[in-house]
Amino acid sequence: MKLIFSQTITLANAQPIKVTLGEDTQVLDEVVVTALGIKRATKALSYNVQEVKGDELTAVKDANFMNSLSGKVAGVQINSGATGAGGATRVVMRGMKSLTKDNNALYVIDGVPIFNTGKSGGEGLFGEMGGSDAVADLNPDDIASISMMTGPSAAALYGSAAANGVVLITTKKGQTEKTTITVSNSTTFSKAYIMPDMQNRYGTSSGLFSWGELANRRYNPSDFFETGSNVINSVALSTGNTKNQTYLSASTTNSGGILPNNSYNRYNFTARNTTHFLNDKLTLDIGAQYIVQNNKNMVSQGQYYNPLPSLYLFPRGDNFDEIRLYERYNTNYGYMEQYWPYGDASLSLQNPYWIQNRINR
């Protein structure tokens, strides 16, 4: 490789020429946030750090902003929960590290590790209902950046809890000598994308290996699903001077899943104030968040409490509209009971509409 620098100079009176290369300084270092909000150049770190700016999270908003990281960070797997709107998300860095323990990364918000209690629902016959997680409660418009930290050195910063990596979240502060009011809205819709291709020509029979009579009805499992929606509204105020900066925000998240009666609603209120004392030698940074969250009817991942097995195994040729009225009055006992005339009355399957309206509260 050759580096060639050329410059033409007119000689006068054959005087001696002194050649000096001019200085051209360019900033090539990328600065990222490490532990406790300390900023360091990427090349100065002994561990891998990848950063995602907050603007990348708000291009297409999700009820759980962690889903917006999918495909944006190399070597990081974002596993979205199958529990419906607002479901928990698992972050796995550089592959699975344990067969028996949790492989999820540690979450750190503004230097403070948080206890993430999210669950995606159990497996097996009686798998329980899934839920949301603590980090999903954050307002994506309040996030300045997210840094992904992996390697043993990252674990040394936060202890054994960070053995699977660290998701370091830095929230926004007030601006200096500038006042900004930001109002945003994000509205998205979702539908079931791929459905199983089933035959509707023949119905069922009493035998295991024979077709039934010609079916006179067509049943499509997609009739059970609905059009999901996710609406996020946010307003933020950022102001301040060289000594004091203030950030205030409020947001609402209203999300409906593609399954009946599945919803996720969240309301965020954030306040943060940063004050500098003693010629910027002392900084007082105070922040508070008030969050109200309510999720309803997240999908169970087992068989007995999951509406999907009974939906896909519904007998071909039978009238699916009959089970939409999922409860019937039992005159012998004097109360409403589930209507599901299929199976052997043991712990097998249940009416999918009854599950979504009576079990998964």
Regions found by a protein language model. Name each.
Residues 25, 170-172, 236-240, 249, ...:
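Transmembrane beta-barrel domains of outer membrane proteins
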Residues 4, 31-39, 72, 87, ...:
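Acidic, small-polar-rich N-terminal luminal/periplasmic segments of exported/outer-membrane proteins
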Residues 18, 90-92, 166-168, 232-234, ...:
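Membrane-embedded beta-strand positions in outer-membrane beta-barrel channels/transporters
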